[in-house]
């Protein structure tokens, strides 16, 4: 069995075993490094992730590989650190020699789609690994994740503009500090954060930049405390200009959060820029220390929505253009790309999976039909299964419908223009999700369960006698379930 096929089969079984959310959190960045006789080597971007997988999932992964190939006896997990070198005291990201700027956005009336795709090819081909300071600190940057390769659209345009402003600002913070970007998995948060870091380190003002995942921050601080080296680490972090933290929802532990709170306060009070990303809004990060949550809410929170059809098609076109760099003979008809863009709607990550499936299948099924593509991608299209509804989705859609913000929905404001949408959102959260009254109350600014119960009963009573409101609620249900 080919190595790539083996890894693909094991990955699919692993995702089915642990569930899509756990898989996206811990295994999305797992890659096949090599297969040598009876040993399979996998790679991950951080030491923390390696330790986490070894301690919790190594036996499961070993069993899945052995189920596919009984000759496999051992699984090793490595850390991808090949592009990191140097011995500087401050473990900061160091700028590579700047390449010629390549501007690339979605096609406009003055820029044909073919030209935009060609620019995507140029941007990826020109990308080179970023250099790093010490190998002891900082999560690795992917040189492919730049502003040039980021697909802009209506769902991310505001966040992209804010990110570019920060990358170009130089020393000192911009007005919106911290910048908090949130969305469900697979919509491009990590790409955008790494684009900020990659651009900032090339800034002629020689910015001192640190990009970290929350899991790496936890591991690095725990290691420093264990080795009695915490003061050195703190001093290093105090001297940076830009701190970028990804996957904030994973920041755990009272001591670690206490240290992060001190760092956050120090940087913000010193007018240093902070950029944070998570899978939910800052006020929904219930596991965070309230002081950290409060500080994160003091800046600007921007949400990514799922990409629209035009964005999805552009992502597929660019992915095809890059794949042709490796295999110039690769051809995928435009109608197949358009069909995939119309039907795989959840996230860019699932779109990437659909594209990889197409490329893989065309190697031995060159005449793929649309019907065959539907069979292959049924697990991504949905297979008629009901969509899992989240409270944050309900809040977002209700807020948009009534022209208020999500933050207003969870605030203490009691004006009529806010109270009615809030009660409707609580009602829909109870009827469309399995969440309890207390949990819904926590998601709406820490309200008591009796407040949620009152809202549900109130909306039920109003619906029974108000046809217009009943139609509004049904419309919202359809929008939420789309």
UniProtKB/Swiss-Prot annotation:
Residues 1-71 are annotated as: Domain I, interacts with DnaA modulators. Domain I is involved in oligomerization and binding regulators, domain II is flexibile and of varying length in different bacteria, domain III forms the AAA+ region, while domain IV binds dsDNA. Residues 363-482 are annotated as: Domain IV, binds dsDNA. Residues 71-139 are annotated as: Domain II. It comes from the Bacteria. It is found in: Cytoplasm. Its main location: cytoplasm. Residues 140-362 are annotated as: Domain III, AAA+ region. Keywords: ATP-binding, Cytoplasm, DNA replication, DNA-binding, Lipid-binding, Nucleotide-binding. Coiled coil: none annotated. ATP binds at residues 186, 188-190. Oligomerizes as a right-handed, spiral filament on DNA at oriC. This is Chromosomal replication initiator protein DnaA. GO terms for cellular component: cytoplasm; plasma membrane. It comes from Rhizobium johnstonii (strain DSM 114642 / LMG 32736 / 3841) (Rhizobium leguminosarum bv. viciae). InterPro entries: AAA+_ATPase, Chromosome_initiator_DnaA, Chromosome_initiator_DnaA-like, Chromosome_initiator_DnaA_CS, DnaA_C, DnaA_dom, DnaA_N_dom, DnaA_N_sf. Signal peptide: none annotated.
């Amino acid at each position: 069995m080919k190595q790539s096929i083996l890894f693909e089969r094991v990955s699919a079984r692993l995702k089915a075993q642990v569930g899509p959310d756990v898989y996206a959190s811990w295994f999305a960045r797992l890659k096949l490094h090599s297969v040598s006789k009876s040993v399979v080597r996998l790679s991950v971007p951080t030491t923390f992730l390696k330790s986490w997988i070894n301690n919790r999932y190594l036996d499961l992964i070993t069993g899945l590989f052995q189920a596919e190939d009984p000759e496999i006896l051992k699984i090793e997990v490595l850390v991808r650190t090949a592009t990191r070198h140097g011995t500087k005291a401050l473990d900061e990201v160091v700028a590579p020699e700047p390449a010629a700027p390549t501007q690339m956005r979605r096609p406009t009336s003055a820029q044909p789609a073919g030209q935009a795709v060609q620019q995507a090819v140029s941007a990826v081909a020109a990308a080179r690994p970023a250099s790093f300071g010490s190998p002891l600190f900082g999560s690795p940057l992917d040189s492919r994740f730049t502003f040039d390769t980021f697909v802009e659209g209506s769902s991310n345009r505001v966040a992209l503009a804010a990110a570019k402003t920060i990358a170009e600002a130089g020393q000192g913070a911009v007005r919106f500090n911290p910048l908090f970007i949130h969305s469900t998995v697979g919509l491009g948060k990590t790409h955008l954060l790494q684009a900020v870091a990659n651009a900032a380190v090339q800034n002629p003002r020689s910015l001192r930049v640190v990009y970290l995942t929350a899991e790496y921050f936890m591991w690095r601080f725990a290691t420093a405390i264990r080795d009695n080296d915490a003061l050195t680490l703190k001093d290093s972090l105090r001297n940076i200009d830009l701190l970028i933290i990804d996957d904030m929802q994973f920041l755990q532990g009272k001591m670690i959060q206490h240290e992060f709170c001190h760092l956050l306060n120090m940087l913000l009070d010193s007018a240093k820029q902070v950029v944070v990303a998570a899978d939910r809004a800052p006020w929904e990060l219930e596991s965070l220390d309230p002081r950290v949550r409060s500080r994160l809410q003091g800046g600007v929170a921007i949400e990514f929505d799922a990409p629209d059809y035009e964005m999805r098609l552009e992502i597929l076109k660019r992915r095809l253009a890059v794949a042709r760099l490796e295999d110039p003979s690769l051809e995928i008809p435009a109608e197949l790309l358009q069909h995939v863009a119309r039907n795989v709607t959840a996230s860019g990550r699932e779109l990437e999976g659909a594209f990889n499936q197409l490329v893989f299948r065309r190697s031995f099924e060159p005449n793929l039909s649309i019907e065959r593509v539907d069979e292959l991608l049924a697990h991504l299209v949905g297979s008629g299964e009901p969509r899992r509804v989240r409270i944050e989705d309900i809040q977002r859609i209700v807020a948009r419908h009534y022209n208020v913000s999500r933050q207003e929905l969870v605030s203490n404001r009691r004006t009529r223009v806010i109270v009615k949408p809030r009660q409707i959102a609580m009602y829909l959260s109870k009827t469309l999700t399995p969440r309890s009254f207390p949990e819904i109350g926590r998601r709406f600014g820490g309200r008591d369960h009796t407040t949620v119960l009152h809202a549900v009963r109130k909306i039920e009573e109003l619906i029974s006698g108000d046809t217009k409101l009943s139609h509004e609620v049904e419309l919202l249900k359809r929008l939420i379930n789309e």
